[in-house]
Regions:
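Short, well-ordered alpha-helices that flank and scaffold nucleotide-derived cofactor binding pockets
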Residues: 25-29, 48, 148, 172
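Conserved catalytic-core segment of NTP-binding enzymes
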Residues: 113-216, 221-222
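Walker A/P-loop phosphate-binding motif and the immediately C-terminal alpha-helix
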Residues: 2-41
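Phosphate-binding loop that captures ATP/GTP phosphates
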Residues: 33-34, 42-92
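Conserved Rossmann-like nucleotide-cofactor binding loop
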Residues: 42, 98, 162
Length: 257
């Protein structure tokens, strides 16, 4: 049975999309069939990490939501060669970067229930093992409904006072939605921060121990979202931490019905 992972943050700039893409790769490197949905329609970006650039005839998730195009026509195979060699597959449902389409979706909205139904239709067509949803930051109806169908939630935050305040709200909402597994990930931890102190503060603030603490890395900054870190920097500490996170998530959702 397919498992749905939502990757969320209360604020933008946490590295949520980067983590979504790299988690998808880690799962696919284990031979899983994974689809990534970019539902951050106001500020899409996960497609950049996969090197996807929409052509004039390429259909995007906006075309499904507002123009009635079939969802299967709006997903694209973005499987890297290393993932193919590992017998995995990755599909991407990218969102439009065109300003008029972004403005239209913000102005008119969309039926989230319809998107949720389409995700599960696609599961059958592509025989998916995992769906990774890259959400829009903050708390809104669209995010709530996509989170509600998740088997596990990855809440991404930085060690920043505003993130602590906002993340508390987001976790409370997720708990009310009865998300089976809630995981806190601290990302972009500067070298000057002591990981154990951050872990303790997170635990004191939310009563959750961080599932992962990921470093702020100059190597990843140099990559500048121009590739997938787990493939470009396979021996990096950040990569190993994300692989460990993917393994933990796989174990969590494998135990859910």
């Amino acid at each position: 049975m397919v498992k749905v992972l939502s990757v969320h943050s209360f604020r933008g700039g946490t590295g949520k999309s980067n983590l979504s893409a790299n988690l998808a790769v880690c799962l696919a490197m284990e031979g899983q069939r994974v689809a990534v949905f970019d539902t951050d329609l106001a500020s899409p970006g996960v497609h950049v990490l996969f090197g996807f650039s929409a052509g004039d005839k390429d259909l995007l998730i906006n075309d499904f939501l507002q123009n009635g195009k079939p969802i299967k026509s709006c997903v694209h195979d973005v499987t890297p060669s290393a993932v193919k060699a590992a017998k995995g597959r990755i599909w991407l449902a990218p969102a439009s970067m065109e300003s008029d389409k972004i403005a239209k979706i913000l102005r008119e909205g969309y039926e989230v229930e319809r998107l949720n139904d389409a995700i599960f239709d696609l599961v059958e067509d592509l025989k998916l093992d995992y769906v990774v949803i890259d959400t829009h930051p903050g708390i809104n109806e669209e995010t709530l409904l996509s989170t509600a169908i998740s088997d596990a939630l990855v809440m991404v935050m930085r060690p920043d006072s505003q993130d602590y305040l906002g993340t508390a709200v987001a976790i409370e909402v997720a708990e009310r939605l009865d998300v089976p597994q809630i995981n806190l990930v601290v990302n972009k931890l500067p070298d000057c921060f002591e990981p154990d102190s951050v872990k303790q503060r997170v635990n004191d603030s939310f009563n959750y121990t961080p599932t992962a603490i990921l470093p702020l890395s100059a190597d990843l900054l140099n990559l500048a979202s121009g590739g997938l870190a787990v493939l470009e920097c396979p021996d990096h500490t950040w990569t190993q931490s994300v692989k460990d996170l993917a393994s933990l998530l796989h174990a969590q959702v494998s135990n859910t019905q």
